[in-house]
């Protein structure tokens, strides 16, 4: 990491308004401009290496002689071992295991501005305002603020507005945002 001054910030990211006098630059940091493409490549590799994929709506999980049984609407699948990796949705499947797994939903806010990825060349975190902006293939992704809010509560429009206002404060005029969502 390197400490940078006001002019170095401008040299690195000229579209950020010149309101910061110092920052920290991580020259070896990396990010994915399209995480979905990476996941699809990994999935293709999984299939090429002999992995199998069934898209099913799992309704319940039980055990028979220590083996997990995944039940769908129409059939059951028995495995020697299984990993439940459904993120925030895992609790719905694990509730009937007889153990209280303390899992809640951490929801992160995202706002997407289309066709603005040229404004930044790397992710930038504005720690004093609690948000970050990352250039993606599809535009700029503005992220910040998290909450424990469950799976079913609607997103907070005031948090979305805060992200939009912060992004405009740092970068100036931006077009109307294209999308907003919660990441679980």
Role assignments for model-derived ranges:
Residues 1-7:
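Dinucleotide-binding Rossmann-like beta1-alpha1 core, especially the glycine-rich loop
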Residues 18-81:
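Helical element adjacent to the flavin cofactor pocket in flavoenzyme catalytic cores
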Residues 11-18:
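Flexible hinge/switch segments at interdomain interfaces of large molecular machines
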Residues 63, 76-77, 81-184:
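Active-site substrate-recognition segment that forms the wall
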Residues 14, 47-51, 169-173:
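Generic secondary-structure signature for well-ordered alpha-helical cores
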């Amino acid at each position: 990491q390197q400490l940078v001054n006001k002019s170095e910030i401008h040299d690195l990211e000229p579209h950020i308004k010149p309101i910061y006098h110092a920052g920290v630059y991580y020259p070896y940091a990396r990010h994915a401009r399209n995480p979905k493409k990476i996941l699809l490549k990994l999935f293709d590799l999984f299939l090429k290496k002999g992995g199998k994929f069934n898209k099913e709506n799992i309704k319940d999980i039980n055990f028979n002689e220590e083996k997990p049984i995944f039940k769908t609407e129409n059939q059951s699948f028995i495995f020697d071992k299984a990993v439940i990796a459904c993120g925030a949705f895992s609790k719905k499947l694990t509730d009937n295991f007889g153990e209280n797994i303390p899992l809640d939903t951490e929801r992160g806010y995202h706002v997407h501005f289309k066709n603005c990825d040229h404004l930044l060349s790397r992710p930038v975190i504005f720690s004093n305002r609690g948000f970050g902006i990352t250039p993606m293939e599809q535009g700029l992704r503005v992220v910040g603020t998290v909450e424990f809010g469950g799976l079913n509560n609607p997103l907070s429009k005031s948090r979305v507005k805060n992200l939009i206002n912060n992004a405009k404060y740092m970068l100036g005029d931006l077009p109307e945002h294209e999308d907003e969502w919660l990441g679980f």
